[in-house]
């Protein structure tokens, strides 16, 4: 760049800094590019699938799927992991259905969890904006988009037509929120439901999510959660096998997926993942129905090994660290150390 252009640019940058604050416009090379920080999901496999060791901080994340597929459980598990790392979390319970006892079982520190049960959508999103602007919150969970009912719809008659009102509300809120979240390094998780497209014929998925298209565009990560099998002990159902697929990912390659167990009353079974990934990565030896770790016999059958890990936390932690090291989760994984296809269960 010639001297006159450089002088004009420097003058313009000074004017911008004076008008909008220092750093409003800067050269990319003037600032060190930091790796994207993440919050663990509580699932080793999903942390791997997301590519950075969890969901990105300072971004919008959407978790969606059919009813009873594990959406809220996953969001609460992320909340627990964030709190364990010293973060402050808020839960916007638009559905008025938060089970405090279940959240506690998942490891959520309910005494220090900020909770709001808003009366209508605008109130919920105003609360989100206010606490995000404070800079004191690390994670906000909104359960759910479908329950963010506009005030006009609540105060109107059942016969009133309110076409597109919620979509406009979401679009306006996300336009305001994205910049604030990035600046304050606050993550917002929107839990969403799916609906069937009316008159859908031919190619493409007949499913869509509620709240319009804005969330699809503004979300840095979208996770599709589906129940794929029931886990039984004898005749009793004790949990679900769940598949989580990363449909959109702006911070790592998308379309990776992970499977894990969600046990009723307990949440994501980390012990089950230790068994599955330990075997896949040759950290745990499997011979027939028997499992062993080095010279240590772990037990016969997957459920017995899970029970062993629940009893022996030191052993479980040792194996977990080895799995994380093999996956590359120890240093904000680059995905070069292990192909997701090698560990997709």
UniProtKB/Swiss-Prot annotation:
The gene is recA. This is Protein RecA. The keyword Cytoplasm applies. GO terms for biological process: DNA recombination; DNA repair; SOS response. ATP binds at residues 65-72. One of its GO terms (cellular component) is cytosol. It holds the Pfam family RecA. Its main location: cytoplasm. Can catalyze the hydrolysis of ATP in the presence of single-stranded DNA, the ATP-dependent uptake of single-stranded DNA by duplex DNA, and the ATP-dependent hybridization of homologous single-stranded DNAs. It interacts with LexA causing its activation and leading to its autocatalytic cleavage. Keywords: ATP-binding, Cytoplasm, DNA damage, DNA recombination, DNA repair, DNA-binding, Nucleotide-binding, SOS response. SUPFAM superfamilies: P-loop containing nucleoside triphosphate hydrolases, RecA protein, C-terminal domain. Belongs to the RecA family. It comes from Sulfurimonas denitrificans (strain ATCC 33889 / DSM 1251). NCBIfam families: tigrfam_recA. InterPro entries: AAA+_ATPase (IPR003593), DNA_recomb/repair_RecA (IPR013765), DNA_recomb/repair_RecA_CS (IPR020584), P-loop_NTPase (IPR027417), RecA-like_C (IPR049261), RecA-like_N (IPR049428), RecA_ATP-bd (IPR020588), RecA_C_sf (IPR023400). It is found in: Cytoplasm. CDD domains: RecA. PANTHER family: MITOCHONDRIAL DNA REPAIR PROTEIN RECA HOMOLOG-RELATED, RECA. One of its GO terms (molecular function) is ATP binding. Signal peptide: none annotated.
């Amino acid at each position: 760049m010639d001297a006159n252009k450089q002088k004009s640019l420097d003058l313009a940058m000074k004017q911008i800094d004076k008008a909008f604050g220092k750093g409003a416009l800067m050269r990319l090379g003037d600032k060190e590019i930091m790796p994207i920080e993440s919050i663990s999901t509580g699932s080793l496999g999903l942390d791997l699938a997301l590519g950075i060791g969890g969901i990105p901080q300072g971004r919008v994340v959407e978790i969606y799927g059919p009813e009873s597929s594990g959406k809220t459980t996953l969001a609460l598990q992320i909340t627990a992991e964030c709190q364990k790392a010293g973060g402050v979390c808020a839960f916007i319970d638009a559905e008025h259905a938060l089970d405090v006892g279940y959240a506690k079982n998942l490891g959520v520190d309910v005494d220090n969890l900020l909770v709001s049960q808003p009366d209508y959508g605008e109130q919920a999103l105003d609360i989100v904006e206010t606490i995000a602007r404070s800079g004191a919150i690390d994670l906000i969970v909104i359960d759910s988009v479908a329950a963010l009912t506009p005030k006009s719809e609540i105060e109107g008659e059942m016969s009133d037509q309110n076409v597109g009102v919620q979509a406009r509300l979401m679009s306006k809120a996300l336009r305001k929120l994205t910049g604030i979240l990035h600046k304050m390094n606050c993550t917002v998780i929107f839990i969403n439901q799916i609906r069937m497209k009316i008159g859908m014929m031919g190619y493409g998925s007949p499913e869509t999510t509620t709240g319009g298209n804005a969330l699809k565009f503004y979300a840095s990560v979208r996770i599709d959660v589906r129940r794929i099998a029931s886990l039984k002990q004898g005749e009793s159902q004790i949990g679900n096998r769940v598949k989580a697929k990363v449909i959109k990912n702006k911070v790592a390659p998308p379309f990776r997926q992970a499977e894990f167990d969600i046990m009723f009353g307990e949440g994501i079974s980390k012990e089950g993942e230790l068994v599955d990934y330990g075997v896949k990565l040759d950290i745990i030896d499997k011979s027939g129905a028997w499992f062993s770790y080095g010279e240590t016999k772990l037990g016969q059958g997957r459920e017995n090994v899970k029970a062993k890990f629940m009893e022996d936390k030191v052993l479980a932690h040792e194996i977990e660290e080895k799995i994380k090291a093999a996956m590359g989760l120890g240093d904000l994984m680059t995905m070069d150390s292990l192909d997701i296809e090698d560990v997709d269960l």
